[in-house]
Amino acid sequence: MVPIALHKEQPGYVINTLLIPWVRAGMSLVVKGVAGPHDVDRTWMIAGGGETGPFAVLDLVGLRTPLQILTAAAEAGDAAAAEEAKWLRREYIDRNKLGIETGEGFYKYPNPAYRSADFVRPRR
């Protein structure tokens, strides 16, 4: 965590407040069939100059954590979160693809594709 001076208290960390909508936007694109996880990450990395995209970050965090967040949002009535949770469970959690901790999530470890110089070359 990064220590900062807060102007006002709020529940949760500042990083999580920023991170959750970012990864949910990426997940929404994938669940709706717009793009795949690697394409979403590649787009973010090329356009934003980041070292990782939302799916690489999810792998590093571990996929159980976003499932818990999505499940809580779904239970609070968020229909999109319910679809995202269902997809994450079906495609990854139930297949024991939990991210870096199991050696596979959206990427395979120890050498994930997003670390390759070729990964950020635009595809045609």
Label for each model-derived stretch:
Residues 15-19:
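Amphipathic, non-transmembrane alpha-helical scaffold segments
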Residues 1-10, 21, 31-32, 37-124:
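NAD(P)-dependent Rossmann-like dehydrogenase/reductase catalytic/cofactor-binding core
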Residues 27:
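Catalytic, metal-anchored helix/loop core of enzyme active sites in primary metabolism
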